[in-house]
Amino acid sequence: MKLLVLDGNSLVNRAYFGIKLLTTKDGRYTNAIFGFQNILLNLLSAHHPDAVAIAWDEKAPTFRHTAYDGYKATRHGMPQELAEQMPVLKQLLTDLGFVQVSKPGWEADDILGTLAAANEAAGGTTLLATGDRDSLQLVDDATTVLLATNRETLPMDPAAIQEKYGVAPPQLIEV
């Protein structure tokens, strides 16, 4: 099975910051919803997956917060204009039949890695769509990261990572 897993938080942030603020006639913000849908439709059209899952972060602290007090301490909260769009986007995705996955104490990255490993164990291949370069360490012969950049989505397989960084994917954690 070819599984496409989207890092929802990463991609919705790219959509939000990549498109000027759009609103409905009654003033509701829609730019993140519009941009995320475009990203999703482009991925579906380009890759024709057998199954799709969208992973989301939860607000609950993770084990990383317990291990390191400063984990993401300098991150700013979600802009209010984006926060207002999140329930609408998630409901739209539910209404369209997309599986959405989140778990308290887990980040979307953790879910991406877990789903990729489970799908690989079942004999499948996985595409991980994200703008987070940390996910590149998950790449192997059965898992490709579709790395969202400012202009394009780059398919990052083991050969592409070796060429760009000069190391194998598991070694990226040391770079």
Question: For each predicted feature, which ranges?
Answer:
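Non-catalytic, usually N-terminal nucleic-acid engagement modules in DNA/RNA processing proteins
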Residues: 1-53, 57, 63-67
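Extended two-metal-dependent nuclease catalytic cores across DNA- and RNA-processing enzymes
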Residues: 22-23, 73-175
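NTP-dependent nucleotidyl-transfer catalytic core
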Residues: 3, 47, 58, 70, ...
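Conserved nucleotide-binding/hydrolysis micro-motifs of P-loop NTPases
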Residues: 10-11, 59-62, 133-135, 151-152
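Short N-terminal helix-initiation segments at or just after the protein's N-terminus
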Residues: 64-66, 72-75
